Amino acid sequence: MESNLQGTFLLNNTQLAQFSEMKAPMCQYSVQNSFYKLSPPGLGPQLAAGTPHGITDILSRPVATPNSSLLSGYPHVAGFGGLSSQGVYYGPQVGSFSKAGNEYPTRTRNCWADTGQDWRGSARPCSNTPDPLSDTIHKKKHTRPTFTGHQIFALEKTFEQTKYLAGPERARLAYSLGMTESQVKVWFQNRRTKWRKKSALEPSSSTPRAPGGASGDRAASENEDDEYNKPLDPDSDDEKIRLLLRKHRAAFSVLSLGAHSV
């Protein structure tokens, strides 16, 4: 039993050995023969012996030129050595260019990167250049006007006489005080609002005036004259305005008569 297995194994090994010896030369011969048939006549002497696809053989090959003997072995490739103009390859209009293709500068950046940079650059919100629209908005910002003491005195005196002004009366008062009708109208609106709030919170009561000497009255009069020449705020200088109205009542009567005569 064992002898039969050994004989069979030896027989099989012998057949395998013969098969490998028979196949190996045929494979080598077929590769060498096919490589020989594909190679041109002038290529054999220039290539070194060995595997044609090795790194050493590939690096040791000479550089092929249009006029070299490597291309001359192929009849359909040898004809390209005589072509000198670009028009033969690309068309007649290309041959009219004075420069070769490699002499023109090439773009190294990607077109998508350039496009992205353009739209990203246009969307940048921050810039050092001033915006004319924002400047116009800041210039149009409403600023509260400041009136002189003479203007506030006349306005307060007129408000004591009447809480509402008609169109002609408002125009005459604005002209006599050097103001605009809009300023007079807004001042009267604010003054009426303040008067209503004050009337609702405080009951009307008269405060007695404290007695004082002549020297004290003179000093107070000088201080009032100084305050009269300074700008006053109708929302915060109520006491000063009341004193000025009491002192210059006669002067304002002359002013009101002159304004109505105009």
Curated annotation (Swiss-Prot):
PROSITE patterns: HOMEOBOX_1, HOMEOBOX_2. Keywords: DNA-binding, Homeobox, Nucleus, Transcription, Transcription regulation. SUPFAM superfamilies: Homeodomain-like. Residues 140-199 bind DNA. SMART domains: HOX. It holds the Pfam family Homeodomain. Expressed in the developing CNS and gastro-intestinal tract. GO terms for biological process: cell fate determination; enteroendocrine cell differentiation; glandular epithelial cell differentiation; negative regulation of stomach neuroendocrine cell differentiation; neuroendocrine cell differentiation; stomach neuroendocrine cell differentiation. The keyword Transcription applies. The keyword Transferase does not apply. It is found in: Nucleus. GO terms for cellular component: nucleus. Coiled coil: none annotated. Residues 197-237 are annotated as: Disordered. One of its GO terms (molecular function) is RNA polymerase II cis-regulatory region sequence-specific DNA binding. Putative transcription factor, which may be involved in patterning of central nervous system and pancreas. PANTHER family: HOMEOBOX PROTEIN NKX (PTHR24340), HOMEOBOX PROTEIN NKX-6.3 (PTHR24340:SF20). This is Homeobox protein Nkx-6.3.
